[in-house]
Design a protein with these regions (language model features):
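Beta/alpha (TIM)-barrel catalytic core signal, keyed to glycine-rich beta->alpha loops juxtaposed to Asp/Glu
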Residues: 1-111
């Protein structure tokens, strides 16, 4: 999945096509868990997790990332955005290597 995404991002960047990425704070699916948010995916809730998820996403070669779909987390997402720091490749790899999905969600390519 990552290789395909990187190829698509590169193609879009080379051809002046804007890229919008979504589901920035999705950590996995709900499976049989009780939903406590209005999203169809299970979102990160802690500020540190939201910071890392948003900063990782905005450190990619994209143009925009819409806000989250869960109102109760909006303040944390906006806070993370206001403090955005471009992550180095090493910092990005550290985030992706330490993230563990709570529940797989094929629609999010989290399996």
């Amino acid at each position: 999945y990552r290789k395909d995404s990187d190829t698509l991002i590169q193609f879009c960047n080379q051809n002046d096509v804007g890229i919008q990425t979504i589901k920035m704070i999705a950590r996995g699916g709900w499976a049989d868990n009780q939903k406590d948010c209005a999203t169809w995916y299970d979102p990160y809730r802690e500020q540190k997790e939201i910071d890392e998820a948003l900063w990782w996403q905005l450190s990619q070669k994209i143009d925009t990332a819409p806000s989250c779909g869960e109102f109760s987390l909006l303040e944390k997402v906006l806070d993370a955005g206001s403090r955005f720091q471009q992550l180095s490749t090493e910092e990005q790899e550290n985030i992706t290597s330490t993230r563990v999905s709570i529940k797989p969600e094929p629609k999010l390519a989290i399996i």
